[in-house]
Amino acid sequence: MSLKGGTAAPAPMAPPRKWYDMTSAEFYVYVVAFMCGISIMMPINAVFSAPSYMLEYYLYATKDPFLVPKMTNFWTNVMTYYNLISMVTSLVVEPLTLLKSFRKIPMLVRLLGGLSVLIIEIIVLMVVPARGTTEAGAVATMCIAGFIGGLGTSIFESTVYGMFGAFPPSFTSIMMGGVGISGVLTSLIQIIVKAALPDTYEGVKKQSYIYYSLDVGIQAATFIALIMMRFNSFAQLHFGDLGGVKSKVDAGSLAGAGENVREPGAEATELEQYTEPAIGQIQEKNAEAHKDDPLAERELSEEESGDSRAVEAAGEAPTSNEILRATSVFSVLRSVKWMFVACGFNFLITLFLFPGIATGMFPESKWFATVAVFIFNCCDVLGRFSSAFRITWPRRYNQRWIIVAASFARVIFVPLLLLHSYHYIPSEAYGYVMQVVFGLSSGYIASMALVLGPQSKGIDNDGKRFVAGTLMGISILVGGTIGTVLSIMTQTIRETY
C-alpha cells in the first residue's frame, strides 16, 4: 500500500503557537472550534444519555404510565433504529453538500441553519409528550426526530469539518476534542442524575428534561458564538466568507497562512520564521516545481476552469466561497483517499461494537453500562486531544500508513468484545479495561485522520481544504452506517439463536 502521490508534499507545518503569543481573536476561534465539536454530538449524546426515557417514550408520549406497547420490537431496539435513521439520512444528505449549488450558500448560513435544525430535533422530542399522542404517534415522532437529527448533523458537521480544515491543524484537534468532551459531559451528568433521581416514571421524565435542556442551552451558546465569528479578524483571514459581504480571502497575498497569521502590511515578527507559505506562494511553488514534469496533474475540469476565469475576470481576489466552487471534489478525494479509508474503517469498528455489544452484556446491572460508557468517552476524548501534540504524529509524510494500519488493526476488538458479550469472558473488570483501550484507539485514529486528511499532498488552498474536511466527515458516516447495520444484524442473530 503506497501513500505516495504525484504532487509535491505540503510545506512543513509550523510549530504550534505558544498560548501567550495568541491574540484574543485567535483564542476566540479556538473556543468556537471547541464549542462546535461539542454541538455536533450533543443531540445524539443527550438522547443516548436518557435510555430509560427513550425505551419507554411511548409511556410519556401517551401520558399513560401503564400502557402495554404493541410494537415491542421497535421499542426494544429504539436506540439502534433512531441512530440508524439519523445516520442513513446524514449519509444521503452530506454528499449533497458538495454539490456546486450548495457550495454557493454562504458559510455562516450553513452553520446556523444546521445548528437550528439540531435544536428542532430536541424540541420535537420534548413537545410531543407535552401535547400527548398515540403509540403510533410516538413511533412516528422517533422516526421524524431521527430524520431531523440526521439532516441537521449532515449540514452542520460537514460545514464545521470543512471550515476548520481550512484553518491550521491545531484547530481541528481542538474541535475533535470538543466532540469527545460532549460524550464525557453527558456521561458524567448521567451518572450524577442517575444517582440523585429515582428510576420511576416521574424521575425518568425529569432526567430527560435535564439532558435535553442542557443540549439546547449549549446549542444556543454555540449559535451566538458563530454569529460573532463574522466580526473576528483571525477567522476572516483564514476563511473570509463568514457573513461579511466585504470580507475577502486573498488566495495569494495573505501574510502567513500557518499557525502565525498577521494582517497584510503588518510588520513581521520573529515568529515569521516558522510561518507556512501563503496560499498563493504554495501554488506558485508547485507550478514552478512541475513545469517540466509531464506526469504532473495540470488539467482542471471544465467547471473549475469556468469558475477560475470568472474570478479572474472580476479583477479582484477570490473569496473563500469562490475558491470552494472552483474545487474538484474527485481530485481532492484522490489526495485524501488513505485518510478517508482509515477514518471510515475506524468508525465502522467503533459503531459496530459500541454501545450495544460493548456495554450490553450485563443488562441486570444498574451501573455497568453507565460506567463503561463513561470510561469509553473519557478515553476517547484523550485519544482525540492527542493529535494536538506533534509527538503523536507520523514523523514523515510517507509514514502515514501507520494510521491506516492502526485503523485496520482495531478489528481485533471484534472477537475480544463479542466473547465478552456472550459471557465467554464473564468479567466486568475485563469490560472496563477493554473500554480504555477501545476508547483511546478510537479517538486517536479518528482525530489523526481528520487532522492529516486536509494536510495531504495536493491540498493547497482554502477550497481544497474545505472539501477535504467535508469528505472526512462523509467517511465517518459511511463507516458508521455500515457498523450500525452490522451491529443490528449481530444483535438480531443473537436474540434469535
From Swiss-Prot:
It catalyses: adenosine(in) = adenosine(out); hypoxanthine(out) = hypoxanthine(in); inosine(in) = inosine(out); uridine(out) = uridine(in). GO terms for cellular component: plasma membrane. The chain crosses the membrane at residues 27-47, 78-98, 108-128, 136-156, 173-193, 209-229, 338-358, 362-382, 401-421, 433-453, 466-486. Keywords: Cell membrane, Membrane, Transmembrane, Transmembrane helix, Transport. Residues 48-77, 129-135, 194-208, 359-361, 422-432, 487-497 are extracellular. Induction: Slightly up-regulated by pufine starvation. The keyword Ribosomal protein does not apply. Its main location: membrane. It is found in: Cell membrane. GO terms for molecular function: nucleoside transmembrane transporter activity. Residues 286-316 are annotated as: Disordered. Residues 1-26, 99-107, 157-172, 230-337, 383-400, 454-465 are cytoplasmic. Residues 286-299 have a biased composition (Basic and acidic residues). It is a multi-pass membrane protein. Nucleoside transporter with broad substrate specificity. Transports adenosine with high affinity. Can also transport hypoxanthine, inosine, uridine and cytidine. Belongs to the SLC29A/ENT transporter (TC 2.A.57) family. Can transport tubercidin, a toxic adenosine analog, but not formycin B, a toxic inosine analog. NCBIfam families: 2a57. This is Nucleoside transporter 1.
